[in-house]
């Protein structure tokens, strides 16, 4: 049998290993010069005004919501069809997540659905750039500006994504992820990009105990003046070990995304006549980062359900993923919102399947996946 083909595998080479070794030998391994380098490189690459490196994108979401003063009695609009961390952070701040449905074919939030969900208690709107494609930001920004509500972009899937003439993260506030399966990784990490001067100052303060200055800053200043707590904060800083990996990964991002694009093109050609339904791409100008390649497995059309298909692929040593089961179908949120019905999110939750996609995949790997899919489906039709 062929060796196991994972759903994702980080493209780590000698450069990343050497970068980590350099940090380990430097004598300074926590937040320091590599974090500053990462933030500077990110701003240079994507044209953003400020970048704040953090321990995770979840930490970034938490700090951004907190910096905006969101708390009990407030509402935050976001799709249920996303990773649960966003909804979790809203709840942990005592606010109410207003989970809305998405377009069945793109998994993007619909602008009119967002507009209808706005109330006098709405304090933020969080759209998700899904699978590497951008939301229609012009319309969403217009709605947010008209209502006087901050727009926070969940850009965990959108590293290297462009919307019309701008990079995601170039304008407004966007939160990125360097998790192990992302387009650029440092195992665990995240970053907030923003052009809001006041917001970034509060985020920088909150990320490290509310001190407003990190350990490296204090070290190079000889710990004078002594830092003081401005307000209670968290410990969400990123180590330089992780940042060093991210710096190298960012330098490779363009080439890695090009390879992702080639893999997706090969998948798309092989599966164009398949009963598996691929995601539709937006009809406005954009550059797709191809973080995920997903198909929908509709049993009525394919003769097999998603879970059975994933199990059959596993038996052939092919890994898959699920991105995502809608948050409102998870136990805690089912119990909290028993009447909430979001048909498009629910349909996608039981049909979505993410196929292997990572830069080091060979064309033979792609063909192995598509051949296996066609073989399995042909047995059930």
Swiss-Prot record:
Protein's UniProt keywords contain Lipid metabolism: yes
Pathway(s) served: Nucleotide-sugar biosynthesis; UDP-4-deoxy-4-formamido-beta-L-arabinose biosynthesis; UDP-4-deoxy-4-formamido-beta-L-arabinose from UDP-alpha-D-glucuronate: step 2/3; Bacterial outer membrane biogenesis; lipopolysaccharide biosynthesis
Keyword annotations: Aminotransferase, Antibiotic resistance, Lipid A biosynthesis, Lipid biosynthesis, Lipid metabolism, Lipopolysaccharide biosynthesis, Pyridoxal phosphate, Transferase
Pfam families: DegT_DnrJ_EryC1 (PF01041)
Transmembrane segments: none
N6-(pyridoxal phosphate)lysine carried by residues: 182
EC number: 2.6.1.87
Domain of life of the source: Bacteria
SUPFAM superfamilies associated with the record: PLP-dependent transferases (SSF53383)
A GO cellular component annotation in the UniProt record: membrane
InterPro entries: ArnB_NH2Trfase, DegT/StrS_aminotransferase, PyrdxlP-dep_Trfase, PyrdxlP-dep_Trfase_major, PyrdxlP-dep_Trfase_small
Cofactor(s) the record lists: pyridoxal 5'-phosphate
A single GO BP: response to antibiotic
Reactions this protein catalyses: UDP-4-amino-4-deoxy-beta-L-arabinose + 2-oxoglutarate = UDP-beta-L-threo-pentopyranos-4-ulose + L-glutamate
Keyword Cytoplasm: no
GO molecular function, one term: pyridoxal phosphate binding
Function: Catalyzes the conversion of UDP-4-keto-arabinose (UDP-Ara4O) to UDP-4-amino-4-deoxy-L-arabinose (UDP-L-Ara4N). The modified arabinose is attached to lipid A and is required for resistance to polymyxin and cationic antimicrobial peptides.
Description of how the protein assembles with itself and partners: Homodimer.
PANTHER family recorded: TRANSAMINASE (PTHR30244), UDP-4-AMINO-4-DEOXY-L-ARABINOSE--OXOGLUTARATE AMINOTRANSFERASE (PTHR30244:SF41)
Family, per entry: Belongs to the DegT/DnrJ/EryC1 family. ArnB subfamily.
Name assigned to this protein: UDP-4-amino-4-deoxy-L-arabinose--oxoglutarate aminotransferase
UniProt source species: Photorhabdus laumondii subsp. laumondii (strain DSM 15139 / CIP 105565 / TT01)
């Amino acid at each position: 049998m062929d060796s196991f083909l994972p759903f994702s595998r980080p493209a780590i080479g000698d450069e990343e290993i050497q970068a980590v070794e350099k940090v380990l030998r430097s004598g300074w391994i926590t937040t320091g010069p590599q974090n500053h380098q990462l933030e500077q490189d990110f701003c240079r690459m994507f044209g953003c005004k400020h970048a704040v490196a953090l321990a995770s994108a979840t930490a970034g979401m938490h700090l951004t919501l907190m910096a905006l003063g969101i708390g009990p009695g407030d509402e935050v609009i976001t799709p249920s069809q996303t990773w649960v961390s966003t909804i979790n952070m809203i709840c942990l701040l005592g606010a109410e997540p207003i989970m809305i449905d998405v377009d069945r074919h793109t998994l993007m939030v619909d602008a009119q659905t967002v507009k209808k969900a706005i109330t006098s208690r709405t304090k933020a709107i969080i759209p998700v750039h899904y699978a590497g494609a951008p939301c229609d930001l012009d319309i969403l920004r217009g709605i947010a500006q008209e209502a006087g509500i901050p727009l926070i972009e969940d850009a965990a899937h959108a590293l290297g994504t462009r919307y019309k003439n701008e990079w995601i993260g170039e304008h407004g506030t966007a939160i990125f992820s360097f998790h192990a399966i992302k387009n650029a990784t440092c195992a665990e990490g995240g970053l907030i990009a923003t052009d809001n001067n006041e917001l970034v100052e509060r985020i920088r303060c909150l990320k490290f105990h509310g001190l407003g200055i990190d350990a490296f800053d204090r070290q190079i200043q000889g710990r004078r003046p002594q830092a003081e707590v401005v307000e209670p904060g968290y410990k969400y800083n990123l180590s330089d070990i992780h940042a060093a990996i991210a710096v190298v990964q960012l330098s490779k991002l363009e080439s890695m995304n090009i390879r992702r694009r080639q893999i997706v093109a090969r998948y798309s050609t092989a599966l164009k006549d398949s009963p598996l339904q691929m995601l539709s791409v937006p009809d406005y100008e954009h550059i797709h980062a191809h973080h995920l390649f997903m198909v929908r497995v509709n049993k009525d059309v394919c003769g097999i359900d998603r879970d059975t298909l994933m199990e059959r692929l596993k038996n052939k040593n092919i890994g898959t993923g699920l991105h995502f089961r809608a948050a409102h179908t998870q136990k805690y949120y089912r119990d909290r919102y028993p009447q909430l019905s979001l048909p498009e999110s629910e349909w996608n939750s039981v049909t979505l399947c993410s196929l292997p996609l990572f830069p080091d995949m060979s064309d033979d790997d792609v063909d192995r996946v598509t051949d296996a899919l066609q073989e399995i489906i042909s047995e059930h039709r």
